[in-house]
């Protein structure tokens, strides 16, 4: 069973480490390099505990970290970042976590992917629990829907 919880300020270090794993996985697509300190970094991370429209979430399975979501609330709500550790992929963890996050914020949503990230596009097409519209922006596909 997947537990989705708001990431508390004292969980920032765990989330920062999960973001490093996410950035490492994503570097196959965006060709990002690590910084001189050996980290990819995520400059906006601290804003998720400061700005009221940003919300960080952690996913756990049996008490173990399994991934995260970073949500920017608005009209529409935006799934800014979403990551599931490889161990938990293709097991239903991602879909359950995504749907739990959508349920926390009823109303209009969007999920976005880069054109090169076809696996993410396929994932979101399965994970969105309602009918959705899909279009593309300059970076890739965007799904828009309303969560109840």
Q: Model regions: which residues?
A:
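A short beta-loop-alpha structural element at the N-terminal edge
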Residues: 2-18
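Active-site beta-strand termini and strand-to-loop segments that position acidic
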Residues: 60-62, 145-148
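Conserved GNAT-fold acetyl-CoA-binding loop/helix
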Residues: 20-45
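Conserved acetyl-CoA-binding loop-helix of GNAT-fold acetyltransferases
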Residues: 84, 90-103
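Conserved beta-strand in the GNAT
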Residues: 56-58, 64-73, 78, 83
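Conserved beta-strand-loop-alpha-helix junction that forms the acyl-donor binding cleft
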Residues: 110-125, 129, 137-145
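A short helix-loop-beta-strand connector motif used in the catalytic cores of GNAT acetyltransferases and
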Residues: 44-58
């Amino acid at each position: 069973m997947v537990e989705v919880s708001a990431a508390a300020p004292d969980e920032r270090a765990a989330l920062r480490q999960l973001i490093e794993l996410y950035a490492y996985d994503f570097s196959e697509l965006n060709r990002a390099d690590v910084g001189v300190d050996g980290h990819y970094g995520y400059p906006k991370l601290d804003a998720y505990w400061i700005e009221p429209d940003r919300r960080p979430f952690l996913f756990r399975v049996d008490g173990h970290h399994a991934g995260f979501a970073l949500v920017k609330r608005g009209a529409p709500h935006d799934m800014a970042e979403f990551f599931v550790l490889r161990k938990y992929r293709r097991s239903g963890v991602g879909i359950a976590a995504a749907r739990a996050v959508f349920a926390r914020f009823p109303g209009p949503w969007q999920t976005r992917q880069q054109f090169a990230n076809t696996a993410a596009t396929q994932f979101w097409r399965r994970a969105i629990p309602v009918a959705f519209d899909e279009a593309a922006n300059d970076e890739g596909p965007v799904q828009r829907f309303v969560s109840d």
